[in-house]
A protein has these predicted regions:
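Soluble extracytoplasmic regions of secretory-pathway and membrane proteins
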Residues: 1-285
Length: 285
């Protein structure tokens, strides 16, 4: 058997060129078969009273990669993730599962191609359990929310409470923006742990933490966005401040210096900020 268009993105574009694809496909096991899962988006640059992404301050630093830049350059001011594309890793069978039936853009495509898409109810439960909220969409939403969390007109006009993404030191003392990351944790007042995507915020020009945002990935809560703000009366350490405290610890500093000798180099992993009850746990691999 010969397979044409074996690359995942290429295979999907042959059938649905009107969908924009995520740059991060991931593989899962469902019913004993390997399945590639990739998020598909509908875009528009004509949504009324909506700001184009390219106008958001610092967008080029946050949204990197070809797929991200294509969205920004296209003047996009509307994006939804209504489809999960699933490709069988062995025989190439492709399914486009609709996870958001309220998207009007996808609704028009479904009218034109009624047999191309499959309802989510027809997806095996084992496969549905692997669907996760996409990092790319979450980056865009959290980037926009940095400014649009301000709901007072005068505060928004003067940009008095603009947030930013924290930075971290990973290699050669160069600061890098902290990327959103997946964790399994229990939210305040929740009954059980959930799989979710989170990112912290700091005030612009400062290093203390002011809030964190999460996108839920499990079951009926899938796609729900929550923001937890900290009291302005108490300053909480942000990732850069935690990096500094780690470097100032005598025992840790001596060990890092030792490891960095004789041609060896220490690479710092992404710093994780994990909310636990009424406190924060920092994990620095």
């Amino acid at each position: 058997r010969i397979h044409y268009h074996r690359l995942i993105q290429e295979r999907i574009r042959q059938l649905a060129p009107f969908l924009s694809l995520d740059s991060d496909p991931y593989i899962a096991v469902s019913d004993g078969r390997l399945q590639w899962i990739i998020d598909a988006y509908t875009l528009s640059n004509r949504y009324p009273y909506s700001e184009p992404l390219w106008r958001s301050e610092g967008i080029q630093d946050v949204l990197q990669g070809r797929a991200m830049q294509d969205i920004v350059r296209g003047g996009t001011n509307y994006i939804r993730n209504p489809v999960k594309a699933v490709v069988d890793a062995y025989d190439g069978t492709l399914k486009l599962y609709v996870v958001d039936t309220s998207d009007p853009v996808l609704a028009s495509f479904r009218q034109s191609f009624p047999t191309l898409f499959t309802n989510l109810d027809n997806a095996p439960p084992q496969l549905q359990a692997h669907f996760r909220y996409p990092q790319m969409l979450f980056k865009i939403q959290s980037q926009i929310y940095r400014a649009y969390h301000m709901d007072q007109p005068d505060v928004f006009y003067n940009q008095e409470d603009l947030w930013d993404f924290p930075t971290q030191i990973t290699r050669e003392e160069n600061p890098e923006i902290l990327e959103p990351y997946y964790v399994i944790m229990k939210l305040p007042d929740a009954e059980a742990e959930e799989f979710m995507l989170i990112v912290p915020f700091t005030p612009v020009g400062k290093n203390n933490m002011v809030a964190w945002m999460t996108a839920l990935c499990d079951g009926d809560n899938y796609g729900e966005l929550l923001v937890y703000e900290f009291s302005r009366q108490a300053l909480l350490y942000g990732p850069r401040q935690i990096d500094s405290r780690i470097d100032q610890d005598t025992e840790i500093s001596q060990q890092l210096t030792l490891w960095n000798q004789e041609g060896s180099e220490v690479f710092r992993g992404d710093l994780l900020v994990i909310p636990i009850e009424e406190s924060l746990l920092y994990v620095a691999p």
